[in-house]
């Protein structure tokens, strides 16, 4: 068995190896190639089909195989690939060949004149060669002119993967050969079969009919003769088909390039030709690696140099080396401004070009170009920069030209990483070309390869040097601190580059080389080295990073930031330049991997006296250096003229064309290029102007330079898209349409294109739909017959019907739109119909009606009719129904079309009613009432919608007919009433008759009885009477329906005598006999019955054994009786129960409820006892310890602690029961560190210095250890146990000191957090529940007292505090491993099961393994409630969605309107809930930074209290909620709505998102905007601070521009929502910001403005623009209900804007529901808040791509940004310097006695060494020490603290009298382990090597952030 499985496994592995081998894969791909050859098979088949002999077949096959072999070789062999792939080569091949082919097949017509034998013979001899050539050339065409790209791509992919490439190519060729042979054999068989079959058929036909003989004989030769023609036609068709996919190289559409600088045009063209012709080898490589096989574009590098107008144009530093002295250089910069087009500098530069002055002069060089002829030819035949592939043109209006995306994202090249050669797949291509150029220049010197070991050692050595430099600088700073210099002076400053020395204006952040390094946008060249040194104050060790040295670093980043250069030429001193050559060339040698051994770097002239000796060498080296960077191949000429330094940077290949579509052309957006034709085929659309602003501008905000623009008319236009299928899809003219995937369209209107690959994913496709329900309905109808219909009250049916009507409508509209001259005809007909209707038809009808009324003696209704006629308004609308006005026709209406909408259409009635409607019937009638507007059709009919079917008009005569019907009905009623009376009378008469008849019958019966009696006495006497009886009986039988027998009631029946007997005696005797017999029978039966009854009676009374006494009952009777009684009881009871069931249930439920309520306290009794005990302990302790402090609100405190203890213990219980075990490594640092920050705070200062450094733990006094133990800092069992972890606890303590004043809010701000209880609870959230702790309540007490002590001036510190928290919070999230790295028990954290989010601010509770250490209550800091002030991480992580339960708890705890505690900057007191203007600019900024969820929320502005948006019932009061967990019932705060959250975990209560959107409620609506502006200002923009904040504002401005969010779906193209109001510190209101937003480019929404320079708009336009923007977001989805609503609003609103008195129409449209008041803005004062409230700005939960700033990522991942000096100056007056007596730490000042409301100084209590260095230097040191770890021991990783003396210098005040017997050596060896220098940090590596990670956005860092810090093992 084992052997079998072993064999089986081996066999499987063998099979897998065979399948995956190169040969098999090559065979497979080759076999596939057989089927992808396409039209090249045509010639091969032709040779066989036409039967031209075996020679031709063989030559065709040979040529075909040779061509295919060349193709395969070209895949592997680059020069052949290049030769075949060049467009010019193919063109040269194609043209003569096609000419020859044409000439060859038509030689009869050309050679008619001299049809000599010589020509014919020669041509015949050429036959075979021609066939060979055909078959050889066509496979070569196949990949380049007639591409089938999929297979080529597959082959390329596998070629890249496999190692043995040649083997793969060979095997694929063999596979192709096999497939080809099989294919040819199959073709032969088919041909043979066809021939045989054909002749067989024709013979059969000959026999059947003689008629067919003649044509059949001629058919076969005819076919054979025309075969050549058939093949030519087929070939032509396939070529046309394939050429449709790829435009012909000849018929290229030369596009107009963007306006080049006229002066530069010629020289640039020359260089273009040069490079293109001479750099073949480089192109070969690049074409292989960088572009696909069929890509005809030349190399990237030749493109880069080509267009001077590109954005990424690099600096040219042109040095005139001949005229001037050798050490003076001129620098020239090009500048292309894409942002500041309107600035005068740009305009001058743009227009004047390079003619500005002598400084900007181009040092031109003349050069004879051998290839002068090629440029026009090349551009004529093939323009390689045109869109010859199916590229979408991605517009980006910030950039001039679109980026070409033919360049692969990946570029493979070897580079050094960690000192070793590695292949990098995102290597910058420009760097590789740079290295190739250097290698070319290196041939001047000798070069030698270094071994990998040497390379690595060199790398290690350089890293050591760098690390030593940086650490030395760091140590110097620490020593300076030690000597007592001020902290701010020691901190490394971030050097800023100033523009102006006097005004101290710094460059913006983006352009500052010091702040951004390689990311800088501007390089400011300084005139000389002395000025340079003045400007650039850097540290001594910092000299590596001189300003211009950063040039080489421009190589490194791969992000596509566009560079801007200032045009300024300055001179450098050669000395300063030469000193830095070493640093400049170091990276070159590093990238090169080879060192230039003959270059003597030390020989560079560093001193002035050495200059002459080395001047020649210097010139040579400089020439080498600068010429190495030159791009010109003919370097000799350039060297003689000038030396050129080119800035090297990552280049992006761009198209040289800026394309526009027809819409942009219509808009005239590009005024300077308005004559240019559009090149993009966009969706068929028309521009419809809906609003023209003709009013005089009464705007005070417009600038003076805009007055000249006032004469232009401003328009607002909608784009009306045709609802036809869009087959253009923004294809560029001349691009390959057919190669576009996903181009299949099968719906009439399709918003998204669907690929046929995913047909199965689409619900119902056009041809694959098989609807079973439809089939069943169809069958049903057929089965049941035509008359019976299935009743379908199905909403789907209704929907289908509506959809069908809609489609018909669209079809009609498109038909009108597509027919030539249809629109003018239709428009004129509509206008005619409108005039006819209004002024001719309706007045005539009114006159006719009223005259008829007069004739019919009725009152005429002239007044009412004419009033209705006046009310009818004919509004001219655009083609898609946007109303304009009565008189204003839409622009170009004859061309674009028109609609005429009739408002209140006159419907002529025969009379007017003046009755008042009753109230109960009114609404019902209104429901059925139709809209009182319609559209006019061409035939004068009315229709509900444009192009809809005409609606049924109410008939004029219908009411008349109704009245007639009523009259007739009345007459009928009267007639029927008479009939009813008659009927009733007849009925009564009949009943009387019946009564009479009954009486008669009774009388007769009575007479009969008398007769019988008489007959008994004497029958003979009565014989005569009998006859009388009989006769009367016959009469009665006639009258009555049933015969009545006479003696029927008697016992003895007597039948009447029918036969008349003559012998009366016989009759008599027979009668008497019968009577006697009957009597006898009767008596006998009676007797029998009597006997039976008597027997029964005897039986009952004569049975003594059964029933002894008649009074007693037997057992059986008893049982039956009891059963009976039981059932009766049950019956009664059940009836009673049914009657009382409701009360019974109620009683049971109440009983259960009471039991629960009674039992819950019993369950939790012990808990409560514990808590009360703890509370008592706390208060006793607090009273003893803090007697001198003020008393606090005792009740509140009790309540708080009571709740907290319940919560704590409950969570202990739940944690113990359900522990989720997890290692700390799975937690984020944010979580752990946040928890640390919430731990119990040390209240005494005297511990701070004790814990400052590691060694002092030896000498701690016992009293201090006891204090530690009670404080819970160390949880050792005995106080003499070794104090191990103080190095880590150092950080704990620092954190505690840092976070203690997290809640130090000013009194005013604290008052805003309205409920007092809530304040207390927030304080209480910081408490911990340690079992050993006796001092638990003191912290809150301190805090509350402190709040009461604080002064109001602390408001000034808010901005400072905000910055501080932001700075420190970012970095303080970094360590949990270090804090717990020694204590194994602390490594595991047990979380409660309610932890849901693992995000930024973690609010769930956790306990560590040892509860003695610290158990922190979960909560959220006040930061979350104070909006922007303390929100730190939210700005950095827009991708995550958090849900904060704590916020909900506060909502639910007490019914307080959320506004009262979420108002951000409102000046409010607790008692007065007045709300004034909120800080709009901050919410704008917040929305700008983090794309918040926006909610479609309509809030009607009213003074009533608004309830928060109820997301799934989440904000309900807690009392209405079902109690799901009875254990937590007493603390409603705990009732987490967990189940709801599980259903939708991304939901966020909406009020929390729109934090400060609820201002202005009690403020009167019509206040002036200027008054609101003052309220809208942030605190920091006061006038006295304005100057100091300019710097920060500028930074912020730049940062925000890089991380812009947007509204709706246009993720890239919309601008900021106006955060500039805050940044620039201006006093503008929100409206100018909106204006700014609206004026930014609406590239996605196609709303264009004719006047773009206008700075401010009227309110109406702002509203209109916002509406339009919203409308356009949904325009593609025509069936959206939201879209319809918005569309209606737009139409009505645009109409209302034009009307002078819109009141009546407004009211009617609101009544009809056309216009929703929630959306329309009718108020005057519009602020951003109101726009959001009304739903005009809709923020949608769309994840948006944000362009990350490099610094922003660093800030996100690492950084405490440094303190600005200016801010320190502003706040210095509040800061007091403390005198700390280091020797007597017991006498330290108590914390609160000298506070003065300043929380900042605590951040400097324990100075973090990390803060000394700048983030950049910090990162550098950290990474270098990381590299150092690879060699040495992990413990020695921080050279700064290796020296014990340095540490000792920081202050030697240890108690050296105790515990000296400890192992001091061990302590010294352990070193100080700050968490600042961890082993490695993925984030740092990612930031350094982003081009290795290939990540340009920060989202992927969140993954690395989780597992960032490894555990350090301590030996």
Swiss-Prot record:
Major place of residence: plastid
Which residue spans traverse the membrane? 18-38, 64-84, 90-110, 126-146, 174-194, 230-250
Q: Which keywords describe this protein according to UniProt?
A: Chloroplast, Membrane, Plastid, Plastid inner membrane, Protein transport, Transmembrane, Transmembrane helix, Transport
Membrane protein topology class: Multi-pass membrane protein
Q: Where is the composition biased (Basic and acidic residues)?
A: 279-288, 1587-1601
Disordered, as annotated region: 260-319, 1566-1631
Q: Which family does it belong to?
A: Belongs to the TIC214 family.
Family matches, as PANTHER family = PROTEIN TIC 214, PROTEIN TIC 214-RELATED
Q: What is this protein called?
A: Protein TIC 214
Organism listed in the record: Platanus occidentalis
Name of the gene encoding the protein in the UniProt record: TIC214
């Amino acid at each position: 068995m084992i052997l079998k499985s072993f064999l089986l496994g081996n066999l499987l592995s063998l099979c897998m190896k065979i399948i995956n081998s190169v040969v098999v894969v090559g065979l497979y791909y080759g076999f596939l190639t057989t089927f992808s050859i396409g039209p090249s098979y045509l010639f091969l088949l032709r040779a066989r089909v036409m039967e031209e002999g075996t020679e031709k077949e063989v030559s065709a096959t040979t040529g075909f195989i040779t061509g295919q072999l060349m193709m395969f070789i070209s895949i592997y062999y680059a020069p052949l690939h290049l030769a075949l792939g060049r467009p010019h080569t193919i063109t040269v091949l194609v043209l003569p060949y096609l000419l020859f082919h044409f000439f060859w097949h038509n030689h009869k017509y050309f050679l008619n004149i001299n049809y000599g034998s010589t020509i014919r013979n020669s041509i015949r001899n050429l036959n075979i060669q021609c066939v060979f050539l055909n078959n050889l050339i066509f496979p070569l065409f196949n990949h380049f002119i007639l591409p089938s790209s999929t297979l080529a791509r597959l082959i390329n992919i596998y070629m890249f993967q496999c190692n043995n490439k040649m083997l793969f190519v060979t095997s694929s060729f063999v596979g192709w050969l096999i497939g080809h042979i099989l294919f040819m054999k199959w073709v032969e068989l088919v041909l043979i079969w066809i021939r045989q079959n054909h002749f067989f058929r024709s013979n059969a036909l000959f026999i059947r009919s003689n008629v067919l003989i003649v044509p059949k004989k001629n058919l076969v030769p005819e076919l054979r003769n025309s075969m050549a023609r058939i093949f030519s036609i087929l070939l032509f068709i396939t070529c046309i088909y394939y050429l449709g996919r790829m435009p012909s190289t000849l018929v290229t559409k030369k596009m107009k390039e963007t306006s080049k600088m006229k002066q530069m045009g010629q020289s640039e063209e020359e260089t273009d030709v040069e490079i293109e012709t001479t750099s073949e080898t480089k192109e070969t490589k690049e074409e292989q690696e960088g572009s696909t096989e069929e890509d005809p574009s030349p190399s990237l590098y030749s493109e880069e140099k080509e267009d001077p107008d590109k954005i990424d144009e690099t600096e040219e530093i042109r040095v005139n080396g001949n005229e001037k002295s050798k050490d003076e250089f001129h620098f020239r910069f090009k500048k292309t401004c894409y942002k500041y087009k309107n600035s005068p500098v740009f305009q001058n530069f743009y227009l004047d070009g390079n003619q500005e002055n002598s400084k900007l002069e181009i040092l031109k060089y003349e050069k004879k170009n051998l290839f002068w002829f090629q440029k026009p030819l090349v551009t004529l035949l093939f323009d390689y920069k045109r869109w010859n592939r199916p590229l979408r043109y991605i517009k980006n209006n910030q950039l001039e030209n679109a980026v070409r995306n033919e360049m692969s994202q990946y570029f493979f090249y070897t580079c050094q990483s960690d000192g070793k050669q590695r292949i990098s797949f995102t290597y910058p291509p420009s760097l590789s070309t740079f290295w190739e150029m250097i290698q070319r220049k290196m041939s001047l010197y000798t070069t030698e390869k270094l071994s990998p070991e040497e390379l690595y050692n060199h790398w290690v050595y350089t890293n050591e040097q760098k690390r030593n430099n940086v650490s030395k600088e760091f140590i110097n700073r620490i020593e300076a601190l030690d000597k007592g210099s001020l902290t701010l002076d020691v901190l490394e400053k971030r050097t800023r580059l100033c523009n102006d020395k006097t005004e101290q204006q710094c460059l913006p952040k983006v352009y500052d080389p010091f702040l951004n390094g390689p990311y800088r946008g501007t390089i400011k060249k300084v005139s000389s080295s002395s000025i340079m040194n003045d400007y650039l104050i850097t540290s001594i060790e910092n000299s590596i990073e001189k300003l211009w040295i950063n040039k080489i670093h421009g190589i490194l980043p791969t992000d596509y930031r566009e560079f801007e250069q200032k045009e300024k030429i300055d001179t450098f001193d050669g000395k300063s330049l030469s000193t830095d050559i070493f640093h400049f060339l170091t990276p070159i040698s590093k990238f090169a991997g080879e060192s230039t051994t003959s270059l003597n770097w030390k020989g560079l002239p560093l001193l002035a006296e050495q200059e002459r000796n080395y001047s020649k060498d210097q010139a040579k080296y400089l020439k080498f250096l600068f010429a190495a960077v030159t791009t010109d191949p003919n370097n000799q000429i350039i060297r003689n003229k000038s030396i050129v330094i080119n800035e090297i940077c990552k280049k992006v290949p761009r198209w040289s064309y800026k394309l526009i579509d027809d819409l942009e052309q219509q808009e005239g957006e590009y005024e300077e290029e308005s004559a240019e034709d559009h090149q993009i085929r966009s969706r068929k659309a028309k521009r419809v102007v809906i609003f023209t602003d003709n009013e005089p501008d009464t705007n005070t905000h417009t600038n003076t330079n805009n007055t000249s623009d006032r004469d232009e008319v401003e328009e607002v236009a909608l784009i009306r898209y045709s609802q036809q299928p869009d087959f253009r899809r923004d294809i560029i003219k001349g691009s390959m349409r057919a190669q576009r995937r996903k181009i299949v369209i099968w719906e009439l209107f399709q918003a998204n294109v669907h690929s046929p690959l995913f047909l199965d994913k689409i619900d119902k496709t056009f041809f694959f739909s098989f609807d079973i329900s439809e089939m069943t309905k169809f069958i049903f109808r057929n089965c049941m017959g035509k008359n019976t219909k299935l009743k379908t009250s199905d909403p789907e049916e209704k929907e289908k019907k509506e959809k069908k009507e809609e489609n018909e409508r669209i079809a009609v509209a498109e038909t009108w739109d597509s027919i030539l001259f249809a629109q003018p005809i239709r428009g004129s007909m509509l206008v005619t119909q409108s005039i006819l209707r209004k002024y001719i038809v309706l007045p005539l009808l009114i006159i006719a009606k009223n005259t008829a009324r007069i004739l019919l003696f009725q009152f005429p209704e002239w007044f009412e009719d004419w009033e209705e006629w006046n009310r009818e308004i004919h509004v001219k609308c655009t083609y898609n129904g946007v109303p304009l006005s009565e008189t204003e026709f839409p622009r170009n209406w004859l061309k674009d079309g028109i609609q005429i909408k009739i408002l209140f259409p006159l419907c002529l009635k025969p009379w007017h009613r003046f009755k008042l409607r009753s109230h109960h019937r009114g609404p019902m009638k209104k429901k059925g009432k139709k809209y009182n507007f319609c559209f006019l059709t061409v035939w004068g009919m009315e229709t509900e919608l444009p192009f809809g079917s005409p609606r049924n008009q109410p008939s004029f005569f219908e009411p008349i007919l109704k009245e007639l019907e009523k009259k007739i009905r009345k007459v009928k009623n009267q007639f029927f009433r008479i009939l009813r009376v008659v009927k009733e009378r007849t009925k009564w008469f009949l009943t009387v008759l019946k009564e009479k008849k009954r009486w008669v019958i009774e009388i007769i019966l009575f007479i009969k009885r008398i007769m019988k009696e008489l007959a008994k006495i004497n029958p003979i006497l009565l014989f005569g009477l009998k006859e009388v009886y009989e006769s009367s009986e016959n009469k009665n039988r006639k009258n009555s329906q049933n015969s009545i027998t006479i003696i029927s009631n008697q016992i003895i029946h007597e039948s009447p005598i029918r036969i008349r007997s003559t012998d009366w005696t016989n009759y008599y005797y027979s009668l008497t006999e019968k009577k006697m017999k009957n009597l006898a029978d009767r008596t006998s039966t009676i007797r029998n019955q009597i006997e039976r009854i008597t027997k029964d009676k005897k039986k009952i009374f004569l049975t003594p054994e059964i029933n002894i006494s008649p009074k007693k009952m037997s057992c059986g009777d008893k049982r039956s009786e009891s059963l009976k009684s039981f059932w009766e009881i049950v019956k009664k009871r059940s009836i009673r129960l049914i009657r009382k069931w409701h009360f019974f249930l109620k009683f049971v439920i109440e009983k259960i409820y009471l039991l629960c309520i009674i039992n819950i306290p019993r369950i939790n009794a012990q808990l409560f006892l514990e808590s009360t005990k703890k509370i008592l302990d706390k208060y006793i302790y607090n009273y003893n310890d803090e007697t001198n402090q003020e008393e606090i609100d005792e009740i509140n405190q009790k309540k708080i602690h009571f709740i907290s203890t319940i919560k704590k213990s409950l969570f202990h219980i739940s944690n113990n029961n359900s522990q989720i075990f997890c290692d700390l490594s799975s937690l984020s640092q944010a979580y752990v560190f946040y928890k640390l920050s919430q731990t119990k705070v040390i209240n005494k200062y005297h511990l701070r210095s004790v814990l400052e450094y590691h060694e002092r733990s030896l000498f701690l006094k016992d009293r201090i250890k006891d204090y530690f133990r009670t404080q819970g800092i160390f949880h050792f069992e005995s106080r003499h146990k070794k104090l191990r972890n103080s190095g880590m606890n150092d950080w704990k303590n620092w954190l505690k000191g840092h976070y203690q004043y997290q809640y130090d809010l000013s009194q005013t701000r604290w008052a805003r957090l309205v409920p007092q209880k809530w304040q207390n609870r927030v304080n209480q959230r910081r408490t911990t529940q340690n079992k050993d702790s006796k001092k638990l309540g003191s912290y809150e007490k301190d805090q509350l007292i402190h709040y009461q002590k604080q002064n109001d001036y602390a408001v000034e510190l808010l901005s400072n505090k905000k910055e501080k928290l932001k700075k420190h919070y970012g970095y303080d999230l970094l360590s949990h491993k270090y804090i717990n790295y020694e204590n194994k028990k602390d490594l595991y954290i047990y979380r409660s099961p309610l932890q849901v989010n693992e995000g930024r601010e973690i609010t769930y509770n956790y306990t560590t393994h040892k509860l003695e250490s610290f158990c922190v209550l979960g909560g959220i800091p006040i930061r979350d409630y104070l909006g922007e002030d303390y929100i730190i991480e939210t700005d950095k992580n827009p991708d995550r969605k958090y849900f904060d339960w704590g916020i909900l708890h506060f909502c639910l705890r007490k019914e307080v309107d959320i506004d009262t505690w979420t108002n951000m900057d409102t000046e409010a007191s607790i008692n007065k809930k007045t709300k004034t203007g909120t800080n709009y600019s901050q919410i704008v900024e917040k929305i700008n930074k983090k794309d918040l969820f926006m909610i479609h929320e309509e809030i009607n502005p009213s003074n009533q209290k608004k309830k928060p948006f109820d997301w799934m019932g989440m904000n309900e009061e807690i009392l209405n909620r079902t109690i799901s967990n009875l254990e937590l019932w007493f603390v409603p705060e705990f009732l987490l709505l967990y189940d709801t959250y599980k259903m939708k975990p991304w939901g966020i209560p909406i009020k929390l998102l729109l934090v400060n959107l609820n201002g202005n409620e009690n403020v009167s609506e019509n206040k002036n905007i200027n008054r609101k502006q003052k309220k809208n200002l942030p605190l920091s923009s006061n006038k006295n601070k304005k100057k100091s904040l300019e710097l920060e504002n500028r930074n912020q401005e730049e940062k925000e521009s890089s991380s812009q969010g947007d509204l709706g779906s246009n993720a890239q193209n919309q601008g900021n929502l106006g955060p500039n109001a805050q940044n620039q510190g201006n006093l503008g209101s929100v409206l100018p910001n909106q204006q700014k937003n609206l004026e930014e480019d609406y590239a996605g929404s196609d709303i264009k403005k004719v006047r773009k320079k206008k700075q401010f708009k009227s309110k109406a336009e702002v509203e209109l623009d916002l509406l339009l923007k919203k409308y356009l977001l949904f325009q593609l989805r025509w069936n959206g209900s939201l879209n319809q609503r918005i569309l209606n609003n737009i139409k009505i609103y645009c109409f209302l804007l034009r009307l002078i008195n819109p009141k009546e129409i407004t009211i009617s449209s609101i009544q009809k529901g056309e216009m929703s008041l929630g959306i329309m803005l009718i108020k005057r004062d519009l602020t951003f808040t109101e726009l959001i409230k009304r739903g005009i700005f809709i923020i949608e939960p769309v994840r948006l791509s944000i362009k990350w700033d490099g610094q922003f990522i660093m800030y996100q991942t690492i950084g405490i940004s440094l303190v600005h000096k200016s801010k320190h100056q502003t706040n210095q007056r509040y800061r007091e310097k403390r005198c700390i007596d280091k020797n007597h730490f017991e006498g330290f000042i108590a914390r609160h006695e000298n506070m003065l409301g300043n929380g900042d100084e605590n951040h400097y209590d324990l100075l973090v060494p990390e803060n000394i260095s700048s983030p950049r230097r910090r990162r550098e040191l950290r990474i270098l020490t990381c590299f150092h770890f690879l060699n040495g021991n992990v413990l020695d990783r921080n050279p700064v603290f290796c020296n014990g003396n340095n540490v000792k210098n920081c202050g030697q005040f240890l108690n050296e009298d105790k515990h000296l017997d400890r192992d001091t050596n061990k302590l010294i060896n352990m070193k100080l382990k700050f968490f600042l220098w961890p082993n490695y940090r993925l984030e740092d590596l990612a930031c350094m090597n982003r081009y290795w990670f290939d990540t340009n956005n920060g989202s992927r860092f969140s993954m690395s952030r989780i597992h960032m810090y490894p555990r350090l093992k301590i030996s």
